[in-house]
Amino acid sequence: MASTFYIVHHEFKAGKAEKWWETAYAAMSPGGGWDDAVAANKEKGFFNHSANAVTKTGPVYCFWEVKDGISAEEFQDFIDGPSGPGFGQDALMNICKPIDTSLMNGQTPYPPVFS
């Protein structure tokens, strides 16, 4: 069976955006641990293809791919948890919507990373 793709709608909780951006920029800077986190998440079956911020205070829309066999509930737990995009700060409200690729004749938003 194929991976599941999700669109995740992130809204910042009140007063949390500035600290979240500081943490995100630090993580993405050289030596910040970003590559290690991406590799660890991929090993767990989660891969973020893109993050798309509308404004600095949100919302942010992300495209995630989830390895076959991982439930929507497990994905939500990951997204809301310390290894997810909130960096353990409880900064985001996350709404995860699976993409029904059958509606587009199997077309996925990105080439799959999980076979």
Residue ranges with predicted function:
Residues M1-P59, E65-D77, I95-S115:
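Short S/T/G/P-rich N-terminal loop/turn motif that feeds into the first structured element of a domain
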Residues I79-D90:
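A common structural junction motif
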